[in-house]
């Protein structure tokens, strides 16, 4: 299981985002932080099969998912 940040397009409801969070946890993943400020989304440990389903969803032109990116440490130097 790897850590990812899933972000959603503007206007996506909290209920819609919750459905994706529920899918993560029902498949054995863990939700980390929820983002509901400048971006809407969440960080999570996501099972490979769930990640694949999210990536397929994100590839559809009218998908509510904006991005799925590996969660990593960012530094400024």
Model feature map: region roles:
Residues 7-15, 46:
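Short, surface-exposed ligand-recognition loops at beta-strand->loop->(often short) alpha-helix junctions
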